[in-house]
């Protein structure tokens, strides 16, 4: 991982899906205010993607940073692997591919060399600035099922060469994958040279299977990790000091949580109550104890969510809390914990 990027990435990052109108429309002013609040809280790493609102998130982030960050202190990452196809007949009032966007496009997976290059140029124009980190978006078997071997080969034979060319030529500083599954990151490291991985939802208080082989490999290869989805679709985004909460159903992986996950969250919350620790604080702080994790990037759709995340991240948590999680088997036995990090 290049030090010129690694040393500039803040522990708390800004996930840009919400300002691309994820599931619901938010006004331009709210998107701008969210970016401004993030900068005010010292957030100097911001992630987006063409898929987020079909270019809307990149446009909004670029416009805000052009005004708020003229010195270009912020490390910006975006993604390739989905090209934007015009859809002039699209119903702009409904949710399309998860977003309510005024942009008449849809995103189509394409991991070829030409598509990656075109995507990079489009993102650079929308962001109005150079791109620091470029991820390939949503490779993997979870995303593509039976098509995964074909698309992985398409990427390694085409899109990967484009990423290498952009990095080696100095157009971007670091390259990696932005995905929801660590297994494809491990496969990619067996076939190529990557600097950083954005892993969403796979190294959290609820899931630590990445510790078995992937994270040790990242340590060996000096690959940095950004943890997306630290709240696991929101099920961990709770105070937790005052008992179970929220309306049913609880959501996990964007669908109703299975009984074993609900039970695990209840066990975590019971420990939170005993130690006076917000569950969301533990969810944000836990991944950062691992030496390869550079940043956590929860979704931030308004200034209150930004300020809340910063408060949760910096709240002191007693060592006895982490010790009880370990003693109860609520975290992997090999997981680094903040009190020993």
List the model feature ranges, each with a label:
Residues 1-80, 84-89, 93:
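N-terminal binding-site loop/beta-alpha segment at the start of enzyme catalytic domains
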Residues 15, 98-104, 139-144, 249:
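Short glycine/proline-rich turn/loop motifs
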Residues 17-29, 101-117, 148:
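Active-site mouth loops of central-metabolism enzymes
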Residues 30, 121, 125, 132, ...:
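Beta/alpha (TIM)-barrel catalytic core signal, keyed to glycine-rich beta->alpha loops juxtaposed to Asp/Glu
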Residues 36, 62, 66, 117, ...:
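Solvent-exposed, non-membrane alpha-helical residues enriched in polar/charged side chains
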Residues 45, 77, 130, 135-136:
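Generic enzyme active-site microenvironment
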Residues 87-99, 238-246:
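Short, flexible, mixed-charge acidic loops at enzyme active sites
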Residues 110-130:
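An active-site-proximal structural segment forming one wall of the substrate-binding cleft
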């Amino acid at each position: 991982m290049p030090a010129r990027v690694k040393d500039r990435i803040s522990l708390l990052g800004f996930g840009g899906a919400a300002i691309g109108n994820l599931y619901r429309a938010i006004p331009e002013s709210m998107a701008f205010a969210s970016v401004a609040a993030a900068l005010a809280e010292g957030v100097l790493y911001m992630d987006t993607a063409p898929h987020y609102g079909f270019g809307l998130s990149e446009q909004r982030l670029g416009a805000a940073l052009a005004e708020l960050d003229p010195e270009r202190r912020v490390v910006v990452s975006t993604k390739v692997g989905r090209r934007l196809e015009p859809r002039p007949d699209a119903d702009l009032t409904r949710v399309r591919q998860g977003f309510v966007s005024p942009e008449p496009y849809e995103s189509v997976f394409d991991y070829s060399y030409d598509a990656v290059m075109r995507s990079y140029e489009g993102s650079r124009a929308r962001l109005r600035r150079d791109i620091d980190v470029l991820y390939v978006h949503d490779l993997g078997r979870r995303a593509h099922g039976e098509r995964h071997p074909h698309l992985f080969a398409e990427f390694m034979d085409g899109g990967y060469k484009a990423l290498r060319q952009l990095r080696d030529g100095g157009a971007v500083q670091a390259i990696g994958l932005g995905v929801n599954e660590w297994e494809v990151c491990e496969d990619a490291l067996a076939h190529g040279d990557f600097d950083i991985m954005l892993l969403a939802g796979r190294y959290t208080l609820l899931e630590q299977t990445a510790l078995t082989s992937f994270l040790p490999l990242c340590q060996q290869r000096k690959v940095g990790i950004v943890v997306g989805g630290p709240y696991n679709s929101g099920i961990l985004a709770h105070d937790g000091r005052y008992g179970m909460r929220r309306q049913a159903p609880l959501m996990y992986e964007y669908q109703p949580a299975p009984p074993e996950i609900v039970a695990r969250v209840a066990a975590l919350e019971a420990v939170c109550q005993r130690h006076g620790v917000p569950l969301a604080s533990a969810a944000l702080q836990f991944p950062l104890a691992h030496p390869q994790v550079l940043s956590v990037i929860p979704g931030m759709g308004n200034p209150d969510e930004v300020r809340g995340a910063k408060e949760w991240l910096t709240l002191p948590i007693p060592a006895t809390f982490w010790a009880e999680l370990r003693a109860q088997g609520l975290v992997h036995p090999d997981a680094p914990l903040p009190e020993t990090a």
